[in-house]
A protein has these predicted regions:
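Accessory, solvent-exposed terminal regions and/or long lumenal/extracellular loops of proteins
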Residues: 245-411, 418, 425
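Short, charged/polar micro-motifs that form catalytic or ligand-binding hotspots
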Residues: 8-9, 80, 172, 301-308, ...
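Short helix-capping/linker segments at secondary-structure and domain boundaries
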Residues: 24-35, 322-330
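Conserved active-site-adjacent core of cysteine acyl-enzyme catalytic domains
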Residues: 2-29, 44-230
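Acidic carboxylate-rich catalytic motifs and surrounding loops in phosphoryl-/glycosyl-chemistry enzymes
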Residues: 34-39, 104-108
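Noncatalytic regulatory segments and standalone regulatory/sensor domains
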Residues: 159-162, 166-169, 173-174, 186-313
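Hydrophobic, glycine-enriched assembly/anchoring segments
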Residues: 418-442
């Protein structure tokens, strides 16, 4: 079963991109341009920007190994899970545009696939979430599958983790799950047809799809179908609501979004602790081994530049949104604030380069190889699998090398973290100024 004529592939911000692609497939256009919606506009309608930061410490499977600390940053407003929670990003965007959502949650993969087939038969693509990397030991069915057939998974084993998506082999620390559109489920050929951030389509076998979708039990094999109106009539209100969400959550004394730290003050908190050698959550304390430092710096770079972003920690995309909003709301003053966010995006990109600097050959090579992987994946998808695997293996090799001997001395590392702290502080001040200007204008 396949949705005929579906050819909308590729995303940057995955949630906004999935909605854009389905609206485009359904023939729904933005009323102010009479062209397909842009990702930037949809992202802004959903609340735009966020500022979440966490460092998590995990006990490894092997008790003889030290606890693992991992860095997490989120730059978009609220979480991009697919569920019934109206405060999640996808329902928020859809509700503001008058798009009806049908959400199916079930613990049964068979019932989930029945919903998928029924939706595809009626001409509706289905949005779902797939795990990318997970520990093979964390779920019994994963371990059993791996024992039966190690070749079921792609070639990379990364720090006791396996990749569930054969086409996605970029190392684990950078991404955990993908929001995807399923537009085909063909039982005779044992294929699931889906989209990703690449501009090319992808395929999984049905067992690969079932395992990847079901590995995180709380997601409940969720499938989601959009039923948009033929015409969007409330764009003005949707844009204003999105800007209000962004400003209020980032400038509020305490986060107005339950369970998430979304305040711009987050960046100032990082600036104060990152290079502090006595701080409990300082990076010198948390990430004190070569592999931890490498994972942290590469993850910081990836999340700013290409994981769910096309650079600038989504601030560049928000600049594009404000440019569109100035036309929709008839407020040309928004263009000036858009320019502020464009400059902030450049500041974030500079920070991402600072994390993997040119004057340290191994870190520079990791940065350039990750950029190469991302460009290949975006443009060529599965057709570039050999080159994608080679790039991923190169990053693995660099990680192994720096785990033995990190290329920066303690003094050089302290200097690097101090420079990064300064950049976080400068970003904090710049974002606060831009957000206050936005609040005063609207």
């Amino acid at each position: 079963m396949k949705v005929e004529g579906f050819s909308q592939f590729g995303t940057t911000e995955r949630t906004a991109g999935a909605i854009r692609n389905i609206l485009d497939y359904e023939g729904v256009v933005a009323p102010h341009t009479r062209e397909p919606f842009t990702e930037a506009l949809l992202m802004g309608i959903g609340g735009g920007l966020g500022a979440e930061y966490a460092t998590w410490a995990f006990t490894p499977i092997d008790p003889s190994r030290p606890r693992k600390a991992k860095l997490y940053l989120r730059f978009h407003h609220v979480k991009n899970y697919i569920d019934k929670n109206e405060e999640s990003l996808l329902p928020k965007i859809a509700n503001r545009l008058g798009v009806t959502l049908t959400v199916k949650e079930t613990a049964s993969k068979d019932r989930a696939n029945e919903f998928l087939l029924e939706s595809l038969k009626s001409g509706k693509p289905v949005i779902t979430s797939l795990s990318v990397w997970h520990s093979q030991y964390m779920r019994r069915e994963v371990k059993e599958q791996y024992i039966q057939d190690p070749n079921f998974f792609p070639l990379l084993l990364y720090d006791e983790h396996v990749s569930f998506l054969p086409y996605f082999t970029l190392p684990y620390p950078w991404i955990n799950h993908n929001l995807t559109i399923i537009y085909g489920f063909e039982e005779e050929s044992n294929q699931v047809l889906l989209t990703d951030s690449s501009t090319k389509p992808h395929t999984l076998t049905i067992p690969q799809f079932n395992l990847s979708r079901g590995i995180i039990k709380s997601r409940k094999n969720t499938g989601l179908v959009l039923d948009p109106p033929s015409k969007i009539t409330n764009l003005h209100q949707a844009v204003r609501a999105g800007i209000h969400d962004c400003v209020e959550s980032l400038l509020h004394e305490k986060s107005v979004v339950s369970g998430a730290n979304l305040r711009v003050e987050t960046w100032n908190a990082i600036a104060k602790t990152l290079a502090n050698p006595t701080a409990k959550r300082g990076w010198l304390t948390l990430f004190n081994e070569g592999w931890q430092l490498f994972d942290t710096l590469t993850r910081l770079h990836a999340q700013i530049t290409f994981h769910n972003s096309d650079g600038g920690a989504l601030r560049s995309s928000y600049s594009d949104f404000l440019q569109e909003a100035s036309d929709i709301l008839k407020k040309p003053q928004l263009c000036k604030i858009a320019n502020q966010f464009a400059n902030i995006g450049i500041m974030w990109d500079d920070l991402s380069v600072e994390a993997l600097p040119d004057d340290t050959p191994q870190l520079q090579a990791a940065r350039r190889t990750a950029q190469e992987w991302n460009a290949l994946f975006k443009i060529h998808g599965e057709a570039a699998k050999k080159r994608l695997d080679a790039a991923a293996m190169k990053i693995q090799t660099i990680r192994a090398e720096v785990s033995e001997t990190f290329p920066l001395t303690e003094k050089e590392l302290i200097a690097l973290f101090q420079d990064m702290s300064t950049r976080f502080a400068e970003i904090y001040e710049a974002e606060k100024i831009a957000l206050k200007a936005l609040k005063n204008l609207l």
